[in-house]
Structure formats: structure tokens, C-alpha cells
């Protein structure tokens, strides 16, 4: 199985070199095409493109201006698994993982990215911000879906072909998973959702669902889960699988308050 996550906007402030083994992103050449486009953008254009405050636009302008096109490992880059710091990654809590769990995740966990397309946990990346839903004109079209869809779908097919149980577990957001061309994907997709139940009313609450997605990814990696039935046994933080509102392609977990 291959489990997919979204990236995070919040990033680790890199202060030290990551000393253990890392990898280069599989689609780095394509990513650098986008970096070159972003290097030509002004602070104002970046603010408009991503609907950012002046302060955030200036930060990301500097990031792109300083982006090392050679991806030198020593030059302010860091493994994706540890660089991303948002709600999903709080649930994932990768700093608590053992080396062998990270090694397992390298071939069983993927992160979709607006800039890099697809990332493995130990892929060394530079700080950036570029959401998948952004309308960035590029050689392939008017947005990043046009740029990445075929490429990302192909790489997912290649990775899934090497899995003992080739199923794509979708823990990514709708914005990011839209990049996957489901018609061209050769393998089954199972999407996992998390709901809160209060007074018999079901709600998906963004921040809680994100954290739960991270916890589920952690559960799958640390226990080397390789079947749908094992996924259904997940019960962290009070979430329980609900058969009544689930289907073969959609596993739904509920936490009762």
C-alpha cells in the first residue's frame, strides 16, 4: 500500500544540518522549472498569486530568490517528513519514529506537493510555499494540475506496481488529491475521512481531521499495515471505524463527544 498526505504551509525553521541519509526528490527537474518561473515573480505578484499578506509574500519572495537550483544537500534543505510542521504533521509526530519506521515509510508514504509534485519522506527539499490549487501559468497550462497531473499519476502507478498490496490510501486534502488522474491510475483508491459526532450530528472539522490523518499515517507506518481490515482497527484519540457510513472506497471514522 502507498499512503498519500498533503504538505503543510507551516515549515520547520532549519537551524542545523540533517546528518542521516536522505534522497533527492524524484521529480526535481520538473520542480526546478517551476522554481525558475517563481524566481521571476515580484513580492506583489507572489502576494496576489497565493493571497498572502505582505510579510508572507516577502518571506516567500526571499525563499525563491535564494532557492539553490542545484539542490546542494548542504544548502538549507531538509527531509520533507521533518520540514513540514502543520496539523497533519503534528499527528504524524515523525520525531518520535524509529529509524526502521522512517525507512519503511520511504517506500510506503508519499506527500503531494505543488512545487515538487510527489515527495518521499526523506526527499531533501528547500523551504517553499506553492499550493497545488494556485493558478500559476506554466508550459503545460494555466495551473499546477495541468503541470503535474500526468506526471504524478505516472509516478504513483510506478510505485504502486512495486507494492505487495497495490492500493492507494488517500489521506490528502481534496485540493491536493485532485492532481491524481483517477481514470489513469491503474490501482484501487481508498479514501479515509474523520468526523466528529455531537448530539447525533456528524461534522468534519478541518483542524481535527488533519491531525487525525497524520495519526492514521503514523499508525500505518509504525505497524506496517498492509490491508484494509487492519486500517479499520485504528482507534487512536477516540476515533472508531463506522461500517454504516463507509464503503469499499471510503473508510469513515467517527469520534463521539
From Swiss-Prot:
GO terms for biological process: response to hydroperoxide. Pfam families: H2O2_YaaD (PF03883). HAMAP family: UPF0246. Belongs to the UPF0246 family. PANTHER family: PEROXIDE STRESS RESISTANCE PROTEIN YAAA, PEROXIDE STRESS RESPONSE PROTEIN YAAA. GO terms for cellular component: cytosol. InterPro entries: YaaA. It comes from the Bacteria. This is UPF0246 protein LPC_0782.
Amino acid at each position: 500500500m502507498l499512503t498519500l498526505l498533503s504538505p503543510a504551509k507551516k515549515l520547520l525553521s532549519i537551524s542545523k544540518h540533517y546528518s542521516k541519509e536522505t534522497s533527492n526528490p524524484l521529480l526535481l527537474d520538473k520542480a526546478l522549472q517551476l522554481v525558475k518561473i517563481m524566481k521571476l515573480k515580484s513580492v506583489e505578484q507572489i502576494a496576489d498569486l497565493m493571497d498572502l499578506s505582505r510579510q508572507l509574500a516577502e518571506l516567500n519572495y526571499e525563499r525563491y530568490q535564494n532557492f539553490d537550483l542545484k539542490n546542494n544537500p548542504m544548502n538549507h534543505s531538509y527531509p520533507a517528513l521533518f520540514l513540514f510542521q502543520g496539523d497533519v504533521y503534528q499527528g504524524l509526530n515523525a520525531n518520535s519514529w524509529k529509524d526502521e519506521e522512517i525507512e519503511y515509510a520511504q517506500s510506503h508514504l508519499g506527500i503531494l506537493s505543488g512545487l515538487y509534485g510527489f515527495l518521499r519522506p526523506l526527499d531533501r527539499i528547500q523551504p517553499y510555499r506553492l499550493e497545488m490549487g494556485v493558478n500559476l501559468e506554466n508550459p503545460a497550462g494555466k495551473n499546477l494540475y495541468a503541470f503535474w497531473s500526468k506526471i504524478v499519476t505516472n509516478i504513483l502507478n510506478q510505485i504502486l506496481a512495486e507494492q505487495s498490496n497495490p492500493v492507494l490510501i488517500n489521506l490528502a486534502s481534496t485540493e491536493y488529491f485532485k492532481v491524481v488522474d483517477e481514470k489513469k491510475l491503474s490501482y484501487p483508491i481508498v479514501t479515509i475521512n474523520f468526523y466528529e459526532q455531537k448530539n447525533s450530528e456528524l461534522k468534519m472539522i478541518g483542524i481535527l481531521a488533519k491531525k487525525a490523518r497524520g495519526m492514521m499515517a503514523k499508525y500505518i507506518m509504525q505497524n506496517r499495515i498492509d490491508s484494509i481490515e487492519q486500517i479499520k482497527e485504528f482507534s487512536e484519540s477516540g476515533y472508531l471505524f463506522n461500517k454504516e457510513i463507509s464503503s469499499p472506497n471510503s473508510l469513515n471514522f467517527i469520534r463521539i463527544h
